[in-house]
């Protein structure tokens, strides 16, 4: 989606290559482009894991090459109140939240968008791999997958609404990552070969267990298998997620030929977290029934069109980078919905997002609250 005619567009410059090429493309189209660098975390500015200072230097260097102004804006208080506090609450409740989803909804497309409008922007743009399309038949703005299937980020953007989408551009969503890198090198961007960021949104890459340990209380408890046998002790339920295989401290795989099925040599996976009893349940084998679900329930739904989809056939992702899975919307009322899947889904995790699609169009989604066993399929 291109912006026309000439407009004042504020670009969120992160210091990465995607937002840098975003700013360049819009400048090439003749728009008045202003860059804003968002600082959203300052608890440990001097830590070896905090990259915001380096990222700002990179963003400023990019702005200089492109020939645009850049502003440094601090949203640390908003991030802590709206994103990080909820992130901690979810972990303390035994769920596994997705901070990138909340960060997009509350910071990049709320706090940042509001600030951009206050400084005279007509639209904002970010380096997300997604697309926005206006549908003249319905009068609605649609959120579409990015053209590069390996980089599509629509899953993280499913909480955006019509007002936000109408004022947002995703220029690199029309490109593949290889093209973005090529453009960056051709115009001499200093961060053309900078690696993609990972880790917690705006907090960066760091040892997760050590980081989480600073903010939440935790209590060790038993690790039990599906037959109730005690296999060891966990360090706190918050530090584990469903489907986890590494770091359980109960032994490894003795026979690499028995990875998917059960048996005494199969690997162990986290299957359940019994918060009330402080028990971590593990099972052997990737395809153990406790790891498979045919149904799920979700809440706190956001529908991009402003209304829930009709009951019937659909497709969904229950985690990022997952292939779309055929499903049926069995109920969608208010903020709640339920899905059933003809093919069992693996390690459906409370706290993660279930995001619905109609082809390339992202319909919205919600937070998974529960998943049903394989024998509960409709």
From Swiss-Prot:
Keyword tRNA processing carried by entry: yes
Keyword Cytoplasm: yes
This protein's GO CC annotations: cytoplasm
Subcellular location: Cytoplasm
GO molecular function: ATP binding; tRNA binding; tRNA-uridine 2-sulfurtransferase activity
Enzyme class: transferase
Database matches in InterPro entries: MnmA-like, MnmA-like_C, MnmA-like_central, MnmA-like_central_sf, Rossmann-like_a/b/a_fold
Site residues, Interaction with tRNA: 128, 352
Chain residue ranges for the region called Interaction with target base in tRNA: 98-100
Disulphide-bonded residues: 103-201
Residues binding ATP, per UniProt: 12-19, 38, 127
Pfam families to which the protein is assigned, alphabetical: tRNA_Me_trans (PF03054), tRNA_Me_trans_C (PF20258), tRNA_Me_trans_M (PF20259)
Region entry Interaction with tRNA, spans: 151-153, 319-320
Active site: 103, 201
Record's function text: Catalyzes the 2-thiolation of uridine at the wobble position (U34) of tRNA, leading to the formation of s(2)U34.
Descriptive protein name: tRNA-specific 2-thiouridylase MnmA
């Amino acid at each position: 989606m291109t912006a026309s005619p000439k407009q004042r567009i504020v670009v969120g410059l992160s210091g990465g290559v995607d937002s840098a090429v975003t700013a360049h493309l819009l400048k090439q189209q003749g728009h008045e482009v202003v860059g804003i660098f968002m600082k959203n975390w300052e608890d440990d500015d001097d830590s070896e894991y905090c990259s915001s200072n380096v990222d700002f230097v990179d963003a400023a260097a990019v702005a200089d090459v492109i020939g645009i102004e850049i502003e440094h804006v601090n949203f640390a208080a908003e991030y802590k109140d709206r994103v990080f506090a909820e992130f901690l609450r979810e972990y303390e409740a035994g769920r596994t939240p997705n901070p990138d989803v909340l960060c997009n909804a509350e910071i990049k497309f709320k706090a940042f968008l509001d600030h951009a409008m206050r400084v005279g922007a007509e639209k904002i743009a970010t380096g997300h791999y997604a697309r926005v399309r206006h549908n003249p038949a319905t009068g609605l703005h649609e959120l579409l997958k990015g053209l590069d299937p390996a980089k599509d980020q629509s899953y993280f953007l499913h909480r955006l609404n019509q007002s936000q989408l109408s004022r947002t551009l995703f220029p690199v969503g029309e490109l593949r990552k290889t093209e973005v890198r090529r453009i960056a090198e051709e115009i001499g961007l200093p961060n053309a070969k900078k690696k993609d960021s990972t880790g917690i949104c705006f907090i960066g890459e760091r040892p997760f267990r050590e980081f989480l340990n600073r903010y939440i209380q935790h209590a060790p408890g038993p690790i039990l298998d599906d037959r109730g046998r005690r296999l060891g002790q966990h360090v706190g339920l918050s530090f584990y997620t469903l489907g986890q295989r590494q770091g359980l401290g109960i032994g490894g795989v003795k026979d690499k030929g028995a990875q998917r099925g059960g048996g005494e040599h199969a690997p162990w996976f986290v299957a359940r977290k019994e918060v009330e009893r402080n028990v971590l349940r593990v099972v052997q084998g990737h395809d153990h029934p406790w790891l498979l679900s045919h149904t799920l329930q979700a809440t706190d739904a956001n529908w991009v069109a402003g209304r829930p989809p009709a009951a019937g056939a659909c497709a969904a992702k229950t985690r990022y980078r997952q292939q779309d899975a055929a499903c049926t919307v069995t109920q969608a009322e208010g903020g709640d919905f339920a899905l059933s899947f003809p093919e069992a889904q693996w390690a459906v995790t409370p706290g993660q997002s279930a995001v619905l699609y109609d082809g390339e169009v992202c319909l919205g989604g919600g937070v998974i609250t529960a998943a049903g066993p394989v024998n509960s399929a409709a």
